[in-house]
Amino acid sequence: MPRAVRATIIQPDPQVPVDRFGPWLASNRVLVRAVPLWQRDVPDVDSLGDGLLVLGGTMSAHDGADHPWIEPLKELMVAAVDAEIPTLAICLGHQLLAEAFGGKVTVNHPGGGEHGATPVSWHAGASDDPLLGRLAESGRSLLAQSHNDVVTKLPPGVDSLATSDHYANQAFRIGSAVGVQFHPEASPELMGRWAELSGGDGRTMRRAMHVHDTEVSRNGRLVAQAFCGQLHTRSMAA
């Protein structure tokens, strides 16, 4: 009998939950262990299971003085890549992954943030990526975004897989890890809550996201399904 497929979810911020990824992972027979970093320490790489999912947060990648888990989390992602553990890093996770390998993040980028349903264009090589390939086949995808900080320099030797009209580094791969600036997990309700937390109009955001949710949800589910597929492959090979 095959063993259970397990993944670890790192949650830096109570305001940034796993949201729709929770039921999507469950429907793909992946058991999860959640690690809320305001309550627990960054885990050891040997305890991650078959995969690692790093969520976003309202803090920045440079807030290590207030959030001492930031450096250990970066070290964990490096260790996960060294161990060839499938890793998906979202928003803040994407930014921490970039800096962990020598990239650069600009906090509160003067060009402004991206919020709401945002078109992302895929570079040619993205269609071959084992995690993002199905999503990239369309050439352009509508995805949920909520960020003001930006990866302005990728790690040495790493190429961008996707760009938006405003920022060039929407997704990248380094070894077994993929970072995405967008939020494949975010529902219209969560996007509205984030808008309210930042002083915006949550009702307007929810309405706008509901208009596009058929496409946005489909695209997010493609990412979740591909991630789960990688976890099952790793589990069977173990």
Where are these predicted regions, by residue range?
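N-terminal beta1-alpha1 ligand-phosphate binding loop
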Residues: 5-25, 38
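Glycine-rich His-Gly loop
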Residues: 10-13, 54-58, 148, 182
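Residue-level signal for inorganic ion chemistry
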Residues: 25, 91, 227
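Pocket-forming structural segment of enzyme catalytic cores
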Residues: 101-188
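Acyltransferase
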Residues: 186-238
